[in-house]
A protein has these predicted regions:
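N-terminal extracellular/periplasmic Venus flytrap/periplasmic-binding protein-like
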Residues: 10-13, 24, 28-33, 44, ...
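Conserved catalytic cysteine-centered active-site region
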Residues: 25, 57-111, 144-151, 224-251, ...
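Active-site-proximal alpha-helical scaffold in enzymes
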Residues: 87-118, 157-187, 258-265, 330, ...
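Glycine-/small-residue-rich "gating" segment that lines the acyl/pantetheine channel
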Residues: 121-158, 220-245, 397
Length: 397
């Protein structure tokens, strides 16, 4: 099989849902903007060489419906011949698209695909079609399949004895690492500024107005966070005996990411500079009511298939859906703290469901290079009870 490379990956800044810079921005518009920038950043890439757009989205309906991947391809500067397909594996949708593109290239059916993910929670949450949403048989037999993600986080905390203190301590670390990374400019290369219009609402009068803004950084993190502040927050999903709070959970946010996946041969032929090799991907199911622990099963499976050990991995990007599941996975598998989410994660910078996996791939590409590492893992839990894991290797020319 052919070598598959990640040539480049860009993303928007992550903006707070409903209150941030993208609260009036369509998902297809922000993604098409990234496609155009990706073409500009890689002048050797002939737009006509791109064969498909595979885009992940956790809620592909409403403003994100109508096969958003095809909409993005048509909105962008790609030729009309470039197709598009939308993928939904909830929080691993962005990683799933990279894996799908990679296997298509690996097999020889394609040479160049744009993958990625997007989520505009601002324009979709509360506006989804709930007609006949619940399958009564499924709900009766496996009720956890319909649990809110926060409920599953509480389940993990209680079932595996993850304390409130451990969750808050991890959340604080995420905030501190993101603040340090932003101060050092470690996210700058992956973020593409975007001019847009946001809606502001006066809290006292309710008056609304639109203002022009430029989203050029992540605005969700709170550098001033303290352990005392986190410990004072009330549980959201189980007010009486719970431990999952707004402070130790991922933040609702809007954003997009696009990743260029190519055969090594075609990339070099065009004079492009790859950043990563794609080395594998796996998905494993688990009980839906504890969906957060999915990577406990998918990580060992992928390492076994790649004939690697835990100590061979130089960088771990584990999506921070909730601190309870991150702490459990970390402690169960023995993930080293100094290699895990080294620049923070979704608790501090936000989690637009469909885009996070693609964002993580782009971040691994840059951080592996900074550290001189070889292997990086991107992994996350998935709604419905799954774990998804991707393996990447730093590119050596």
């Amino acid at each position: 099989m052919r070598n598959v490379v990640i040539v480049d990956s860009v993303r928007t800044g992550l903006a707070k849902s409903f209150r941030g810079g993208f609260n009036q921005t369509r998902a297809d518009n922000m993604t098409a903007h990234l496609v155009d920038v990706l073409l500009e950043r890689n002048p050797g890439l002939d737009p006509a060489a791109v064969e498909d757009m595979i885009l992940g989205c956790g809620a592909p309906e409403g403003a994100q419906g109508h096969n958003i991947a095809r909409n993005v391809a048509v909105l962008s500067k790609l030729p009309i011949e470039v197709g598009g397909t939308t993928v939904n594996r909830y929080c691993s949708s962005g990683l799933q698209t990279v894996a799908m593109a990679a296997t298509q290239v690996q097999s020889g059916f394609s040479d160049c695909i744009m993958a990625g993910g997007v989520e505009s929670i601002s324009t979709t949450q509360g506006n989804t079609n709930m007609h006949m949403y619940v399958n009564d048989t499924l709900a009766a037999e496996v009720p956890g399949i319909y649990h809110a993600m926060g409920q599953t986080a509480e389940c993990v905390a209680k079932r595996y004895n993850v304390t409130r203190e451990a969750q808050d301590e991890y959340a604080l670390s995420s905030q501190q690492r993101t603040a340090a990374a932003q101060e050092a400019g470690l996210y700058d290369d992956e973020i593409v500024p975007m001019d847009t219009v946001m809606k502001l609402v006066n809290k006292e009068t309710g008056a609304e107005k639109e203002v022009e803004v430029t989203v050029d950084k992540d605005d969700c993190n709170r550098p001033e966070t303290t352990l005392e502040g986190l410990s004072s927050l009330k549980p959201v999903f189980d007010p009486e005996g719970g431990s999952v709070t707004a402070g130790n959970s991922s933040q609702l946010s809007d954003g997009a990411s696009v990743t260029l996946v190519m055969s090594e041969e075609k990339a070099l032929e065009m004079g492009l500079k790859p950043k990563l090799y794609f080395r594998g991907f796996t998905v494993v199911g688990c009980q839906p009511d504890e969906m957060g622990i999915g990577p406990v099963y998918s990580i060992p499976k992928l390492l076994k298939s790649a004939d690697l050990k835990m100590e061979d991995i130089d960088l771990w990007e584990l999506n921070e859906a909730f601190a309870s599941q991150v702490v459990h996975i970390r402690d169960t598998l023995g993930l080293p703290t100094d290699k895990l989410n080294v620049n923070g994660g979704s608790i501090s910078i936000g989690h637009p469901f469909g885009m996070t996996g693609s964002r993580q791939v782009g971040h691994v590409a840059r951080e592996l290079n900074r550290r001189g590492g070889k292997y990086g893992i991107v992994t996350m839990c998935v709604g419905g009870g799954m774990g998804a894991t991707g393996l990447f290797e730093a590119y050596q020319s």
